[in-house]
């Protein structure tokens, strides 16, 4: 009886050791199939088979030792690219198709990433998406910068890109904040309108006034020039001045930008 009990205990001990060895081996195999990448300071953990899905690409070359890649301080492969955009690259490798969040506006940057990682399929899908966006008519948005007491005074900026209108609006608000400790009641900001207390015309140009003490942001002419320069830098073109009777753009009441 005692011999049977001892024998069973030895069998259990052997089974436990055997299972531990198997678990350890499975753990090693699991780790060997995973890979941690440091892309521009962002860590991504994925399977090697995901990175090698498409042959003759940058990531496949790293996994199979065809391409030498530096390591970071923690021993992870370091790739000096856009860490935020890499998630879209990785999702393309996982899904085999391009899936982007609504309102994604970084097609050109993503196209550069696709080119760097040598993913022709991704590059083609990004290009196709960009071309479709260009063909899709975009609703024109506007920003009106007016006098609280006279809506006929001021400037209207029209554009077919809402994000650019927001950029100009943010710039005006930022400059205005730099002139004041806080916004007075006389200064009104809404979705499409920025209203100043007064537009005062002088020899130096129309001044955008905020407070009773005549603190002003800038001249209206300066604002027009800055809006035009911002638009050109962002790849827009000045379609026309909507009020051509004024002659010079500086004297126009409205500007229309298009991309």
UniProtKB/Swiss-Prot annotation:
Residue ranges of domain BTB in the record: 33-134
Coiled-coil features, chain-numbered ranges: none
Pfam families according to UniProt: BTB_2 (PF02214), KCTD4_C (PF19323)
UniProt cross-references to InterPro entries, sorted A to Z: BTB/POZ_dom (IPR000210), KCTD4_C (IPR045740), SKP1/BTB/POZ_sf (IPR011333), T1-type_BTB (IPR003131)
Residue stretches spanning the membrane: none
BP GO annotations: protein homooligomerization
CDD domains attached to this UniProt entry: BTB_POZ_KCTD4
Superkingdom of this protein's organism: Eukaryota
Protein name per UniProt: BTB/POZ domain-containing protein KCTD4
Gene: Kctd4
């Amino acid at each position: 009886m005692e011999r049977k009990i001892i024998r069973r205990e030895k069998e259990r001990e052997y089974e436990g050791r055997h299972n531990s060895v198997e678990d350890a081996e499975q753990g090693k195999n699991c780790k060997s199939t995973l890979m941690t990448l440091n892309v521009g300071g962002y860590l991504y953990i994925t399977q090697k088979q995901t990175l090698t899905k498409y042959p003759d690409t940058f990531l496949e070359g790293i996994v199979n030792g065809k391409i030498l890649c530096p390591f970071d301080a923690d021993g992870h492969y370091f790739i000096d690219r856009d860490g935020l955009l890499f998630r879209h690259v990785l999702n393309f490798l996982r899904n085999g198709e391009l899936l982007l969040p609504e309102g994604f506006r970084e097609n050109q940057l993503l196209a550069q990433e696709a080119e760097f990682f040598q993913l022709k399929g991704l590059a083609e899908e990004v290009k196709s998406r960009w071309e479709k966006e260009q063909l899709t008519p975009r609703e024109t948005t506007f920003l009106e910068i007016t006098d609280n007491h006279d809506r006929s005074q001021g400037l209207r900026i029209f554009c077919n890109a809402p994000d650019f209108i927001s950029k100009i609006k943010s710039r005006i608000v930022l400059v205005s904040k730099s002139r004041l400790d806080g916004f007075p009641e006389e200064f009104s900001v809404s979705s499409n309108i920025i209203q100043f207390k007064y537009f005062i015309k002088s020899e130096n140009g129309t001044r955008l006034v905020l407070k009773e003490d005549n603190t002003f942001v800038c001249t209206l002419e300066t604002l027009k020039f800055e809006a035009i320069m911002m638009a050109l830098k962002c790849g827009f073109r000045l379609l026309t001045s909507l009020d051509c009777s004024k002659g010079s753009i500086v004297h126009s009441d409205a500007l229309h930008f298009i991309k």
